[in-house]
Amino acid sequence: MKFAQPHNPLLPSVPDIVFSAIVLAIVLPFFWWFVIPRISKLLSDRSSLIEGKISEAASAHARALETLELRKQQLDEAKSEASQIRQEARDDAQLILQQARETADETAERVMLHAREQIQAEKAAALLSLRSEIATLALAAAGKAVSEKLDDDKKSRELVSASIAKMAEDAG
């Protein structure tokens, strides 16, 4: 009789090992041809999808950066254009102000010239009137002197002086 060795509880029994090997031989090809390829395909598809999303995000990020740069450039151009427009407006305002001053100066000069001409005309008319008045008074004085038949030069001078004084009073 052989001594039976005691059974180790940690090791499976021989029938369990044989049954497990048969089940594994049946199930392993099924997993190898059907389940593993599907899982691999699913993981590959998921990986491709994630990589596609990452590349889309990268291209969207690149487009966003390009758009940002474009907007910055447009903003800089708009600022430059606005600055140029403001400068042109200042220049135009200075030109308009200068033209207005020149027009005002020309108008003032014309008014002054017209006033001088009017003063000269009135002065000439006053002188003409004064000469006419003096001539009339001189004739009147001469007529008076002749009518009184003055013999004396002294009296004649007094009469002329009185006539001139009267003329000065009438003129003033």
Curated annotation (Swiss-Prot):
Keyword list, A-Z: ATP synthesis, Cell membrane, CF(0), Hydrogen ion transport, Ion transport, Membrane, Transmembrane, Transmembrane helix, Transport
Transmembrane segments annotated in the record for this chain: 17-37
Main location, first listed in the record: membrane
Gene3D superfamilies: F1F0 ATP synthase subunit B, membrane domain (1.20.5.620)
NCBIfam families: ATP_synt_b (TIGR01144), PRK05759.1-3 (NF004412)
Record note on quaternary structure: F-type ATPases have 2 components, F(1) - the catalytic core - and F(0) - the membrane proton channel. F(1) has five subunits: alpha(3), beta(3), gamma(1), delta(1), epsilon(1). F(0) has three main subunits: a(1), b(2) and c(10-14). The alpha and beta chains form an alternating ring which encloses part of the gamma chain. F(1) is attached to F(0) by a central stalk formed by the gamma and epsilon chains, while a peripheral stalk is formed by the delta and b chains.
Gene: atpF
Protein name: ATP synthase subunit b
